Amino acid sequence: MIINKTRDSPSPKTLEVIGIAAVTVNGYIARHSREKTLWSKDLPLFKKQTKNCAVIMGSNTHKTLSDGLPGRKMIIVNRTDNPADILRRIDQKRCFVIGGGKTYSKFSSYLTHLYLTIHPLVFKRGIRLFTKLEKEISISFVRLVPVVAEEGIFQFQFKVE
C-alpha cells in the first residue's frame, strides 16, 4: 500500500506518531465536518490505545467531541501551526493524530504508524482520511486486531517506512 509522505522531515526525538482512524471501505472518515462518528464501532479500542497519551486533532474534530477525551492531553491544531514544533513539545513516548483529514495530511510526514479500523460502510461523499498529501511512501503491515470480528471489523496496524 502506498501513502503520500514528505521524506525530508524526520520525526522529532524517538516519538511514535500514530495516525488512528475509523474509516469506511472507500476511505472516508466522516460524511461532513460536523459529524459525530456514531457509526464507528472501535471506540473501546480507541480509548484503550490512546489513554494517557497526547492526542492531536483539528478544531472541527474537537467540536464533534461532546465530552472531550478524559485521560488524554488534547492538542487542538489550526492551519498555521507547525507540526514539528507541536511534536517537539510532547514529552511522551507516543502520541496519536486523531483527525480530521486536514490534520492527518498536515502530520503525514511525521507519522510512524497508522492504525486504521475499516468499517463495512460506503459513503457517497465526505471527508477522506488524507485530504492533501505531497509524496508517496510505503507502509508495511504489522498486525490485525479484531474489533467486532463477527461483523468483519478489524483494526489494521501499519508501520510507516
Protein language model features and the residues they cover:
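Enzymes that bind and transform nitrogen-containing heteroaromatic metabolites
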Residues: 1-161
